UniProtKB/Swiss-Prot annotation:
Protein name listed in UniProt: Gamma-glutamyl phosphate reductase
GO cellular component terms, semicolon-separated: cytoplasm
BP term (GO), one: L-proline biosynthetic process
Organism: Corynebacterium efficiens (strain DSM 44549 / YS-314 / AJ 12310 / JCM 11189 / NBRC 100395)
E.C. numbers: 1.2.1.41
UniProt gene name: proA
Length: 438
């Protein structure tokens, strides 16, 4: 009989963990599917009461949340997690107040469920109407942002959906505590705790279990970096809504108010450099005077931004301290104080560059020429096109839509900020009086 090695034992433990995770994901998805019809029928008043109660519960139990979060932060630092990621992970009293405020905001939004989108009486007398209905079981796959746990719950509940949440293992203590609090609130309303459930995250394969649970899960929404999103979209058999990465471009035309263009560019790059609507590439028209090209580059550098570009191209008009760009720079969503800068020969060259490297999130132009602006808007393929405005405006709240679950860069079902209406489908209801079709 051959003795087991430590490697054999480790493999067995891994196999058992995988089997346990798979069973847990499918069991929770089955329970979610079972309770979904009940949640779909909740009235607006009840949903709003739950959201407001959840906001209060988060504040009342903030010490519990912060303690759990501190364990995640300690583990993150021990593993060498970057401080920028630690910042995304961290929760304090102020951030918890912001999360609670988000739930209150959702409570104040119009309930999309039951909204009649169109209706008419057919020639044969049948009354027909199209109404909004919940999607059903909504799966979320996301990275180390505990606020997404609560945001997803709030938006799912208000739109009549059940939430299956697969967060990052780096936020497991925070997410477990948050979901426990939300489930406790649901229980006080005699509603199933399975309305929101946290899925296991010990292995990456649990994501695959969720995104292939066709028949149990109605939609999966990935939210995070390009690697996560691509893995979900490419591996899913469940329908997905792609919240894309943001390699956002800002084109400065030759006919432009340079001061205004610089202000918009700096705002888009530095307001919050770690979000998907941050400007990542600046394209400068070759027709812009060299002195103004230099002003653009220096303004970025003065704001603390590292400029990447073709050094010879930028040095030709006096720029210094430029990092030589590689092909990867034009593709990059930096999410940092870095930007790629290139000189292009007019709006058509800018459009061509954007078409090659865009993630179809947000693209912007600064120009005084209405015809150039219209050409840019007509030919750029993106969820949002900004004309003389910062890329930072791609946001559900800025659009007047309220809270959002993400920014969709796909073309089917939803595109742009995904708020409550985008978390619903529609149903056609036809009412006759004994009609039969000849």
């Amino acid at each position: 009989m051959t003795a087991q090695t430590s490697s054999d034992v480790t493999d067995q433990k891994t196999d058992l963990t995988r089997e346990s995770e798979r069973d847990e994901v499918l069991a929770k998805a089955t329970l979610a599917k079972k309770v979904a019809p009940e949640i779909a029928q909740l009235g607006t008043g009840v949903k709003n009461q739950i959201l407001l109660a959840a906001a209060e519960a988060l504040l009342e139990r903030s010490a519990e949340i912060i303690e759990a979060n501190s364990r995640d932060i300690a583990a993150g630092r021990e593993s060498g997690m970057a401080e920028s990621l630690i910042d995304r992970l961290a929760l304090d009293e102020g951030r918890i107040e912001g999360i609670a405020g988000g739930l209150r905001q959702v409570a104040g939004l119009t309930d999309p469920v039951g909204e009649v989108l169109q209706g008419r009486v057919m020639e044969n007398g049948i009354q027909m109407r199209q109404v909004r209905v919940p999607l059903g079981v909504m799966g979320m796959v996301y990275e180390a942002r505990p606020n997404v746990t609560v945001d997803a719950f709030g938006l799912a509940l208000k739109s009549g959906n059940v939430a299956l949440l697969r967060g990052s293992s780096t936020a497991v203590h925070s997410n477990t505590t948050l979901v426990g609090i939300l489930q406790d609130v649901l229980a006080t309303f005699d509603l199933p705790r399975e309305t929101v459930q946290l899925l296991p995250c010990a292995t990456r394969e649990s994501v695959q279990d969720l995104i292939t649970a066709r028949g149990l899960v109605d939609v999966v929404i990935p939210r995070g970096g390009a690697g996560l999103i691509n893995a979900v979209v490419m591996g899913a058999t469940v329908p997905t809504i792609e919240t894309g990465t943001g390699n956002c471009h800002f084109y400065i035309d030759g006919d432009v108010d340079v001061d205004s263009a610089i202000a918009m560019l700096i705002n888009g790059k530095t307001r919050r450099c770690s979000v998907c609507n941050a400007t990542e590439t600046a394209l400068i028209d070759s027709a812009l005077p060299d002195v103004d090209k230099l002003r653009v580059v220096r303004a970025l550098q003065d704001a603390g931004v590292t400029v990447h570009g073709r050094v010879a191209e930028l040095e030709a008009f006096g720029a210094t301290d430029v990092v030589e760009a590689t092909e990867n720079d034009w593709d990059s969503e930096y999410l940092s104080f870095d930007i790629a800068v290139a000189v292009v020969d007019g709006v058509d060259a800018a459009i061509e560059h954007i078409e090659k490297y865009s993630t179809h999130h947000t693209e912007a132009i600064a120009t005084n020429n209405v015809f150039t602006a219209q050409r840019f808007a007509d030919h750029v393929d993106a969820a949002a096109v900004m004309i003389n405005a910062s890329t930072a405006f791609t946001d559900g709240e800025q659009y007047g839509m309220g809270a959002e679950i993400g920014i969709s860069t796909q073309k089917l079902h939803a595109r742009g900020p995904m708020a409550l209406p985008e978390l619903t489908s529609t149903k056609w209801i036809l009412q006759g009086t004994g009609h039969t079709r000849p």
